[in-house]
Amino acid sequence: MSSRDKPKTFAEVREEICKRREEMISRDNQKKTKTVAQVREEKGKRREEMISRYNQKKAKTVAQVKEGKGKRREEMISRDNRTKPKTVAQVRDAKRKRTFDHVPRGTREPHAYLRNDPAPQVASVPKSVPEEKDVILDRILSNVPRRKKTTSYEFVPPKHPQEPQWLLQVMSRMNGAGDPKLIIEKNLDSNDVDPRQNRLSIPINTVIQNDFLTLDESRLIDEDEITNEGNMGVAAFLVDQRTKKWNMGFKQWFMTTDSGSSYWSFVLRGEWSNVVETNGLKEGDKISLWSFRSNDILCFALVPPTSSVVESLDK
């Protein structure tokens, strides 16, 4: 039977238990909380460290600030003395000293080398001549960049053709208010005179005076369907030179050309095909469209070309 497998005696077991207890007590002593005196001592040390750091960072007194300013002033004066131009006497004195450094002390005779200079002058600064104030001012102004002359242009509004006399007479009979406004001048295209399409297109970018609609009418046109179908838009009248009146609907369409480009356009619908037939309008005819108000109702006046008026009157 080996010594490891041999059972321990009661005394050996007690000795091991005592050793373990001593180890546990020593570990507890190392980990146990500090006393009040130890905590106060540590707080005092930390307070002293904070006070020392504060004293290093705290603001200087007035005397210390003045002392620092005096030192900086002396440094600036010394730098200025080193950089300011020397007089002729100072330059010669410095040259003499450099020369005497190579001459033995017993043979130095400064009076034999230097001559008297009764009027010392500044070596590097030329003597300034007093100038008149006007001369100085002219010299300063000559270096100032001059402003370029700007020409002002007066805005001249474009001249529109004068409203026809018959339109003023029609407005007076229909209780028209305000001045008539020129909407568009255009040459009729094939779509404008096509009875199947029955509409006059007024591209928005070609409108001459665009303030002929009220706020409610503009909102109604903007909220209309983009499909170019459905509502009639804003109800209006159209009159011609013979004071004949037609019912119209004024809308806004999104139109596309044969080339594929698209644009917004106002459109006059309703009895437009009857207007074309009655006034003998053809493709290429140049017309003018005016706008006015009659009892707050939107009205348009068509000014056809002279040849169409003559032909329609002959009929």
From Swiss-Prot:
Q: What is its main location?
A: nucleus
Keyword Nucleus tagged: yes
Q: Does the keyword Ubl conjugation apply?
A: no
> Keyword set for this entry?
DNA-binding, Nucleus, Transcription, Transcription regulation
State one Pfam family annotation. At2g31720-like
Query: Its GO CC terms?
Result: nucleus
Q: Report residue spans for region: Disordered.
A: 24-129
**An example Gene Ontology molecular-function term:** DNA binding
Tell me the DNA-binding residue spans.
Answer: 204-306
Spell out the Basic and acidic residues composition-biased ranges.
Answer: 39-51, 66-83, 100-114
The compartments listed are: Nucleus
Return the PANTHER family for the record.
B3 DOMAIN PLANT PROTEIN-RELATED, GENOME ASSEMBLY, CHROMOSOME: A10
Q: What is this protein called?
A: B3 domain-containing protein At1g05920
What is the originating organism of this protein?
A: Arabidopsis thaliana
